Amino acid sequence: MKDNGFLKNEQTENILELKLDEINFNLEPINGITLENIDIKKDLYKHHELLWKGFNHEGQAPLDEDTINKQKLMLSAPHLNPLLHVVAKNKCNEYVAYCGVWFNDKTDYVYVEPVCTIPEYRNKGIARMVLMEALKRAYDLGGIKSYVISDSNFYKSIGFKQHSHYTFYWHNR
């Protein structure tokens, strides 16, 4: 490849796969936590703040018009099905975890992106709960397998298995 002008990049992607007909979707409820699908119009700010905290950003989530417009654009993606975007709420109705999965009925697979939990609710099984609920809903719609770009033990503990690994090369012109 080097002779053809390609340079190896440090970036790689690891793809994990889970066959949805091989998993048990029944999880014990977690006291004080309820699940529901995201209401895109009503929950824009709550969703943005959850992502901000869930991905370990410092300080308050920016709520300026440009940021919120980008959030609206993301949540208006053509194949976004709100039923497949599951949030966990605490007793105060605050979002504490989120899982988005993407499924198009012209395919047989589900793509997981993203999954996050705010720091004070981590290691309680909530991320697993929102992921499994989202995957169950996608399975009910016809999804057969699921993919995630990750090498995290979190996904492996649920049953995701190694599918593929990619190394990126850039063409040096």
Locate each region found by the language model.
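Extended non-membrane alpha-helical scaffolds
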Residues: 85, 135, 164-168
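A conserved beta-strand-loop-helix scaffold within acyl/acetyltransferase catalytic domains
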Residues: 58-116
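Conserved active-site tyrosine of GNAT-family acetyltransferases
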Residues: 1-2, 6, 155-156, 160-161
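Conserved beta-strand-loop-alpha-helix junction that forms the acyl-donor binding cleft
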Residues: 144-156, 162, 167-173
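A short beta-loop-alpha structural element at the N-terminal edge
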Residues: 34-49
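Acyl-donor-binding surface of acyltransferase catalytic domains
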Residues: 1-33, 167-172
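Conserved acetyl-CoA-binding loop-helix of GNAT-fold acetyltransferases
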Residues: 117-119, 123-136, 140, 148
